[in-house]
Amino acid sequence: MFNQKNVAFVITDPQVEFLKSTGKGFGATKDVLEKVNTIENLTKLLALAKERGYKRFISPHYFYPHDHKWQFKAAGETMMIENEMFWRDSQYSAIPEGSGADMIEEIKPFLDEDTIVVNGHKIFGPESNDLNLQLRKNGIDTVILAGMNANLCVDSHMRELIELGYNVIVVNDAVGAPGEEAYQAA
């Protein structure tokens, strides 16, 4: 049985960009989101975590104007930066309501003082943010993982967290992916 002291829920990229029709990545994820009922299941998962007193961590995706100046980029980074996906004008300004970088409305009721939103990751895992630090400082050794995209950020987070010694459980109906093949591959 899980306990609230060492188990946490980690959600990757629960943002408009992939989860809502106004997002630039939604066209690629729409079919899987509908098939597995991702948004509803993600919302239920967060409601359960909050109700039972588990810590919740959000590992979002963000890009800023200074990211355009990188000396090299992976193909996925190039595509996201050129299309201004998960875009924020500055790390010092608020995220525009409803923008691709904004969290979806369905999960906002669960983003409270007991939710830790870690620094944004770039591509694709938590190596470039403070998720590991936050989990360790909170005494977490087991992660229940969900979010977007199953074959990219969820998979990379899972692999890195396992390498770091965490027990990881992926909730396969609370993830989405850019197509059925990508969903099945993950």
Residue ranges and their predicted role:
Residues 19-35:
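Acidic/histidine-rich helix-loop elements
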